[in-house]
Amino acid sequence: MVLLGRSAAELKAWVEAQGQPGYRGQQLHQWLYRKGARSLQEITVFPKQWRAALADVEIGRSEIRYRHDAQDGTVKLLLALADGETIETVGIPSSDRLTVCVSSQVGCPMACDFCATGKGGYRRNLACHEILDQVLTIQSEMGRRVSHVVFMGMGEPLLNLPAVLQAITCLNRDIGIGQRHITISTVGIPQQIQRLAQHQLQTTLAVSLHAPNQALREQLIPSAKHYPLSQLIADCRAYVQQTGRRITFEYTVLAGVNDRPQHAEELAQLLRGFQSHVNLIPYNPIAEAAYQRPTDQHLRQFLSQLQALGVTASIRRSRGLDRQAACGQLRQAQLIA
């Protein structure tokens, strides 16, 4: 049994099964989620003899393999999991919030052509406790409370929906992060957007679009061959109608590839009458791809074209770029010496 991810009631039942009074469950809950205990030996309110007897009980915490601090304050961690697999997670601070970009899988099966994670292949899904651990570890390393969580790290969250939903429940119930402060990002998986809508969450759905037509999207996102853009947009419209929540569309801008005037016109036509917002993300370079990052001037020009066509859009500035901690740059292994 892994303790991280258990509710206060479940922890109470567990300590009572160990022959301890029920209030120890609330103490355990506080030490796991508020104080970030990495082992039961740290929980000094427990009797020493009982702590010794629990030496083999797994809390579910990872080991930090390295930490890199970017010039803008962003922190990237490589975490080693219990089975030796590794993932990266990123803490993004600002004056009034701390956002954690969490991974949902070890690697990613989507193999997007401009993303470092997909270049390394896919290993497995993360368990709920491995997602929660990323939040608690960033919180401890950065010395402040996490306020926002975005499922935009390694992996495709909708291919690991049960663990992601369980993690969202725990983030809200046990760590105190409101659902409206949680974002789930997806490239689009058939039937999964509909399944997510059925849960009626107050989270934000971010759809990685990256192209305004089917042919170009298939070049950039191989899985798009199995999920026509027309169906994806139809599912997104149904999601908005069912949940009342606005969708964010992520659009990585690749110089000379998807940023021409005709692309702006196609995107405006695609999203006409849609309750949505488009985030333009300038491409963050990786060694395995030959794409180019657009100039700031060209990016602003593309934004202006979209806005003139009636698209609600903005430019999302990348954080942690100098430490390969930006969108599309996360990996399973350390590249920076």
Swiss-Prot record:
Cofactor remark: Binds 1 [4Fe-4S] cluster. The cluster is coordinated with 3 cysteines and an exchangeable S-adenosyl-L-methionine.
Additional notes on this entry: Reaction proceeds by a ping-pong mechanism involving intermediate methylation of a conserved cysteine residue.
The protein's enzyme class: transferase
Pfam families named among the record's database cross-references: Radical_SAM (PF04055), RlmN_N (PF21016)
Protein known as: Probable dual-specificity RNA methyltransferase RlmN
Cofactor list: [4Fe-4S] cluster
Database matches in InterPro entries: Aldolase_TIM (IPR013785), Methyltransferase_A (IPR040072), RlmN_N (IPR048641), RNA_MTrfase_RlmN (IPR027492), rRNA_lsu_MTrfase_RlmN/Cfr (IPR004383), rSAM (IPR007197)
